[in-house]
Regions:
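Basic, flexible Lys/Arg- and Gly-enriched helix-loop patches that mediate nucleic-acid binding at interfaces
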Residues: 1-235
Length: 235
């Protein structure tokens, strides 16, 4: 890897800024000052320091975000704030969200630059489960639980795969947990519409074995732990 690319990956500076940084003699490779941005380094073996602090290279990073309402699950948008905008600390890593969460929904979003893992997690063949907490306009009963279990026919004729509905409270505004392994557009909202009910609040709380860290306020984020990363990769 070129030294200027390494410095960018470690969030020291942009590649265009690297010449100025190197000119100041602030970067050392294996103890020697280097001022040539184009030299090749081995990011796994060479010791590179900036201001005498060792730079640690990580090819992939994995971020848990508690998405607020009004933010879109995209890498860029001309009108709305995106989930990537909320994690600008890692802008140099070119993160993208693993799947979608509707603009008006809140909760768990995982972002990474690991395209291979994203492909695995989003593959319909993998049946990766996602759990949501919902508030529903209308009373829920056992017939709704059975409908989720057997699959629900949406307005376009699509029959959803088996899911799970756990009723917390049944009232004019009911509360429940819903588990599905698909990600069709507005899927849960459309499933409840098919049951003559309306979703008034939706929060994703779990993807596979990764649970939303409840210490994160909306808009806050943290890196996944090694245990969480390994759990994601164990598909």
């Amino acid at each position: 890897m070129r030294l200027d690319k390494f410095l960018k990956e470690c969030n020291v500076c942009s590649r265009s800024e690297s010449k100025q940084v190197l000119k100041k003699g602030l970067v050392k490779v294996n103890g020697s000052v280097v001022k040539d941005a184009s030299i090749k380094i081995d990011e796994n073996k060479d010791v590179i320091t900036y201001n005498d602090e060792v730079l640690k290279y990580e090819e992939f990073i994995y971020v848990m975000l508690n998405k607020p309402a009004g933010v879109v699950s995209a890498t860029e948008d001309t009108r709305d704030t995106t989930v990537v905008d909320l994690v600008k600390e890692y802008a140099h890593k070119d993160l993208f969200p693993f799947g979608r969460l509707d603009k008006d929904s809140v909760g768990l979003v995982i972002l990474s630059n690991d395209g291979k893992l994203a492909h695995e997690l989003l593959s319909p063949k993998k049946h990766v489960s996602k759990v949501y907490y919902l508030k529903i306009k209308g009373k829920l009963d056992n017939s709704d639980i059975e409908a989720f279990k057997n699959g629900i026919t949406l307005e376009d004729g699509y029959l959803t795969k088996e899911g799970k509905l756990e009723i917390i409270k049944s009232d004019e505004i009911s509360e429940c947990y819903a588990t599905i392994s698909e990600g069709k557009f507005h899927q849960l909202k459309r499933m409840f519409i098919a049951l003559n009910k309306e979703v008034v609040f939706l929060k994703r709380i779990k993807i596979k074995d990764i649970e939303l860290d409840e210490s994160l306020n909306e808009g806050e984020y943290r890196l996944l732990s090694e245990e969480e990363i390994n759990s994601l990769k164990n598909i």
